[in-house]
UniProtKB/Swiss-Prot annotation:
CDD domains: ADK (cd01428). Pathway: Purine metabolism; AMP biosynthesis via salvage pathway; AMP from ADP: step 1/1. GO terms for cellular component: cytoplasm. Monomer. GO terms for molecular function: adenylate kinase activity; ATP binding; zinc ion binding. AMP binds at residues 31, 36, 57-59, 85-88, 92, 161, 172. The keyword NADP does not apply. This is Adenylate kinase. It comes from Lacticaseibacillus casei (strain BL23) (Lactobacillus casei).
Length: 218
C-alpha cells in the first residue's frame, strides 16, 4: 500500500499518520525526517541539502526529488510507504510519478483529511500558556478546571504565542490552501484522491481511512 497523506495544519494529520503506521506494515516518510536522515548519513544529496538549509535557503526540487528517490528505494518501503509533507508542488508531484514508476512502487491512494478552515482557526488559535509555569491549555479542548486559574501552579496570568494568534493562523492556512488545492485537483484527475471528514472523533476519522485502504487494497 503506497500512500500520500494530506491535510491542512490542525486537521489531525500527525495523529492519523501514527495510527496508520501502527496498524499497517508501511514506512512513514515525513519530509523533515527524510532530510535529517540524508544529512546525518552524509550522502551527496544530504550534503547538498545541508548547504542550502545552512544558508536559510529553500532546497531546490532537483535535490529534494533525489532524496525522495533514494528514500523510496530503501527496502523498508517494499511493503508500502506513506509520504507526509511531499509533494508540495505540481512539479514535485510530476517528479514523484516518474520516481515511483522507475522504482515500480506506484501510488495507490492520496488521502486528504478535510476540515473547514474556520474550524481549524478555532483549533489552532485556542491555545494559551500559563506565564508562571508554562502549562498549555486550549479554550475549547483543554481549558483550566477553574477559569482563569492554572491547574498546575495556581497562576492567573496567561499568554498566547504569536504563532497561535488568529491572524497568524489564518495567514498560515491561506498559504497552505493555495499550495494544496492544485495538488488535490491533480490527484483527483488521476483518480487517486480520497477525502476523509476530519471534523469528527479521531477514531471515526481513522475508521474512514481504514475503509478507504481496504477498498484500495482489493
Amino acid at each position: 500500500m503506497n500512500l500520500i497523506l494530506m491535510g491542512l495544519p490542525g486537521a489531525g494529520k500527525g495523529t492519523q499518520a501514527e495510527r496508520i503506521e501502527d496498524t499497517y506494515p508501511i514506512a512513514h516518510i515525513s519530509t523533515g525526517d527524510m532530510f535529517r536522515a540524508a544529512m546525518a548519513a552524509g550522502t551527496a544529496l544530504g550534503k547538498e541539502a545541508k548547504s542550502f538549509i545552512d544558508k536559510g535557503q529553500l532546497v531546490p526540487d532537483s535535490v529534494t526529488n533525489g532524496i525522495v528517490k533514494e528514500r523510496l528505494a530503501e527496502s523498508d518501503t517494499d511493503a508500502g510507504y506513506m509520504l507526509d509533507g511531499f509533494p508540495r508542488t505540481i512539479q514535485q508531484a510530476e517528479a514523484l510519478e516518474t520516481i515511483t514508476a522507475d522504482l515500480k512502487k506506484p501510488l495507490d491512494a492520496v488521502i486528504n483529511i478535510d476540515v473547514a478552515p474556520a474550524k481549524l482557526v478555532d483549533r489552532l488559535s485556542g491555545r494559551f500558556i500559563c506565564k508562571t509555569c508554562g502549562a498549555t491549555y486550549h479554550k475549547i479542548y483543554n481549558p483550566p478546571k477553574v477559569a482563569g486559574t492554572c491547574d498546575r501552579c495556581g497562576g492567573h496570568e496567561f499568554f498566547q504565542r504569536e504563532d497561535d494568534k488568529p491572524a497568524t493562523v489564518k495567514n498560515r492556512l491561506k498559504v497552505n490552501i493555495e499550495m494544496n488545492t492544485p495538488l488535490l485537483d491533480f490527484y483527483e484527475k488521476k483518480g487517486l484522491l480520497h477525502t476523509v471528514n476530519g471534523d469528527q472523533d479521531i477514531d471515526k476519522v481513522f475508521a474512514e481511512i481504514k475503509a478507504i485502504l481496504a477498498a484500495v487494497a482489493k
